[in-house]
Structures are given as C-alpha cells and as structure tokens.
C-alpha cells in the first residue's frame, strides 16, 4: 500500500504525467456522462424488454462494451464496436490485398491512409448498424417512443445521432491516446466493462447472503478465490513470451563496429489476444438471430445452441475459439516476412540457415505456442459458463473469463507500463519497481 501511495505522489510530481492523467480522467468522465443520455423521444422507463434481451449472447457483449448504453438506448448505444469491426476488416485486408500490404510498408504515410479507410468503413458500418438497432428497439420496446412521435420520422434523426455518438467516442479515444495515458480506444472499452462491475458485484453479494444459512458465505469466498486465481493466471500467461535469439553480423564503418550483438524476437503465447473469442461469439450469435426472426418451432439441437450453459453450446464454442486462434495467429504473424526482414538486416537465428529454414523454424515455434495458448483462451472463454454451475449470477459471471477478463488484464497492464515509462523518464520508479527517486545509477542505467 505504501508503494502504491508513493507511486501516486510520483505521478503528481511529474507535471506532464499529471496533465495526461487528468485529461484521461476528464475524457472518460465525458464518455460515461454521455452513456446516460437517452435518445430524444425515448422513454427510459419503457426499455425493460430491451434490457432483458441483452442478458445473453452477442447482445450482452455489445451492452458490456458500451457500459450499459446499448440497453439504455443512449446516444452512445453503438459504442466503439463499429470502429473495432472496421479495424478487424482492415487487418484482414492488409493480409489478403496487395494494395493494403503496400500501405503497411509505407510507414507513417501508409498508416494515415489506412486510418482514413478505417474511418470511412466505420461510417458505412454505422449507417447499417444504427437502423438495425432502431428496428430491434421498435420490435422489443415499441412503447418506449413518446406518444405522438412516429417511428418512421424518428428513425432518420436517431440514425444520425447514433452515428455521431460513435464517431464522438472515437474522437475521445484518439484524444486520450494523443494527450492522455494508455490506448484511448482500449481504455473506453475497459471503462464500459468496469462500469458494470459494481452492480454485478452487489447482485452477487445479495444473492449469496440471502442464502447464508445454506452456505452462501462459503460459496462467495470460494468464488472470490477462483476469480483471483483466474486473474493471476491470465496476467502471467498474457505476458508469456518465447524469446527467439537473433544474431546480427558485425559491420565496421570507419573506426566503429556495429552489430554483432544478440537480440531476441518475442513471440507471444497469446498472439491473437481476445480476437478469437469475439469471432466465436459472433458466430454463436447466428442461431439466436435466426430464431428471433423465425416463426417456426425451434428444434431441440437449436435450443441447445441457444443455451450458453449447455454442453453442446460450449463444445462448439471451444472448437471455434481454438480454430480462430490458429487462423488469427496465421494472418497476423508472417514467418516468411519475418525471415526476409531478418536476412535483409544481416540477421540470423543461431544454428538455423537464413531464408526458408528460418521461416520454417519460426512457424514451428509459433505452432508450439499456439496450441497451449488456444487451449487456455478456450478455457477462459467458457469460464462464465463454468461459473454458472456454481450458481454465480450471469452479470458477475462475465468477469470470470471471456472477453471482459482478457480486455481488462491487457488494458491495465498496458496502461501501467506506459505510466511506468513516464516515471522512468523522470528518474522515478513506479508500481513495477521500488517506489523511490532514482539516483545517478538509475540515470546512467536509463
């Protein structure tokens, strides 16, 4: 605790870091405030059916990412997910389309063009998702619209308001990245997830302590122990890397010698991160979408696929997560390109020939890392369902695993590392080191 307080003091002493933290808090507060502003013409008291619909499936994922704005028909209801979807599409295009591959290799100018295309695609997705959201709102909560207002005339301005709200969130995220601390888009998603935690925790405590005579207190303690263990395991494994040694040939320029030092390529255990879970959840949502717009009787198999606690649902879910982990790792890490870059810079892996042998070696290492990584991601993905077996409330069970846990762990670690780097630049230690002012030795080391 003393170390934490000392780190906060150090953060306040560094003027640039203090300003960045205050800007980050200001923009996140603006985002949370906007999440409570309901669309004009909507009666928030009539949104019960929409909120019950977001209790499971992809709807719950969207509601979680938006911090409850989705189920509250807020101006920020669509959240940052359209931009995330556009970014994923652009990542896939950068692998499959030569034009976007070329842009990636053009450095800063290419990155700006890709960002421009991403924004254009985001706007296109918004003008598809916004009417879809409003149509679903009309189906689930038709009484929510104020009397005297026609849904037909409400749709057009509401579509533009929802689109503008999402683009404003994107602007907030970019300002946090530029002038604040951490990745702004990731922080906004994390804030949306954390916003649901207090209510979920209170509901879980209430449900357990009403059954205190039947062992509710013991089960609650067991839940907290399991949650702590899963979070610790997630932190350790998300930070896990395999360091592949790379030796660079020596070069002599004038009287100076360059190269010759051994460096490392860090291959992460979770190269795909949270993306396989998002892809798998999107596919598992398809049966629910079919049932919602179908009037026929639902088959028993489809009923099992609609129940996220059934054995069939979770088996299919695990297979999809593992498959998407291999797929996403394959498209984001290119061993052939890595081997070519290494050869171009006169680098080589000790004991491995440059070129094709190096590419094969890197691919073998990646395959060995992807298998345990995919299994752990699959385990994390079904942890909320396993928590349900302990009668954990669904709202609190989401924090036992799945997308929410991996995002929280990743964003918190990334933000702490950025704060740490700001402190070290001013010769302070932070949470990851001892909390004191660095002396001359620290300056020399840096």
Give the positions of each predicted feature:
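N-terminal cationic and glycine-rich segments that engage phosphates or anionic surfaces
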Residues: 1-104, 109-446
């Amino acid at each position: 605790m003393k170390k934490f307080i000392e780190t906060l003091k150090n953060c306040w002493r560094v003027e640039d870091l203090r300003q960045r933290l205050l800007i980050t808090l200001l923009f996140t507060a603006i985002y949370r405030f906007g999440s409570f502003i309901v669309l004009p013409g909507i009666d928030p008291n009539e949104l019960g059916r929409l909120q019950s619909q977001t209790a499971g499936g992809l709807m719950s994922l969207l509601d979680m990412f938006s911090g409850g704005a989705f189920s509250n028909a807020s101006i920020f209801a669509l959240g940052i997910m359209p931009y995330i979807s556009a970014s994923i599409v652009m990542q896939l295009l950068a692998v499959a389309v030569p034009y976007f591959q070329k842009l990636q290799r053009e450095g800063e100018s290419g990155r700006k063009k890709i960002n421009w295309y991403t924004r254009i695609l985001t706007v296109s997705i918004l003008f598809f998702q916004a009417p879809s959201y409003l149509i679903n709102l009309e189906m689930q909560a038709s009484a929510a619209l104020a009397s005297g207002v026609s849904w037909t005339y409400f749709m057009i301005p509401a579509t533009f308001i929802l689109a503008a709200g999402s683009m404003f969130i994107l602007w907030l995220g970019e300002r946090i990245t530029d002038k604040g601390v951490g990745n702004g888009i990731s922080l906004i998603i994390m804030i949306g997830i954390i916003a649901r935690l207090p209510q979920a925790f209170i509901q879980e405590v209430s449900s357990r302590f009403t059954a205190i005579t039947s062992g509710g207190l013991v089960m609650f303690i067991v839940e907290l122990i399991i949650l702590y263990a899963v979070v610790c395991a997630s932190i350790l494994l998300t930070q896990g890397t395999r360091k592949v040694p790379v030796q660079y040939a020596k070069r002599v320029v004038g009287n100076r010698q360059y190269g010759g030092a051994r460096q490392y390529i860090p291959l992460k255990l979770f190269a795909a991160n949270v993306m396989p879970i998002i892809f798998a959840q999107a596919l598992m949502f398809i049966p629910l979408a079919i049932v919602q717009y179908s009037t026929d009787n639902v088959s028993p198999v489809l009923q099992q696929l609609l129940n996220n606690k059934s054995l069939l649902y979770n088996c299919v879910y695990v297979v999809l997560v593992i498959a998407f982990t291999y797929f996403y790792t394959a498209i984001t890490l290119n061993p052939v390109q890595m081997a070519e870059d290494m050869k171009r810079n006169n680098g080589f892996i000790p004991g491995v020939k440059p070129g094709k042998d190096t590419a094969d070696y890197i691919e073998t290492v990646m395959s060995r890392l992807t298998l345990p990584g995919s299994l752990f991601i699959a385990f994390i993905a079904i942890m909320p369902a396993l928590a349900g077996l302990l009668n954990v409330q669904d709202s609190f069970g989401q924090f036992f695993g799945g997308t929410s846990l991996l995002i929280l762990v990743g964003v918190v670690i990334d933000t702490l590392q950025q704060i740490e780097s700001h402190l070290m630049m001013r010769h302070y230690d932070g949470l990851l080191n001892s909390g004191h002012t660095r002396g001359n030795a620290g300056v020399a080391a840096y």
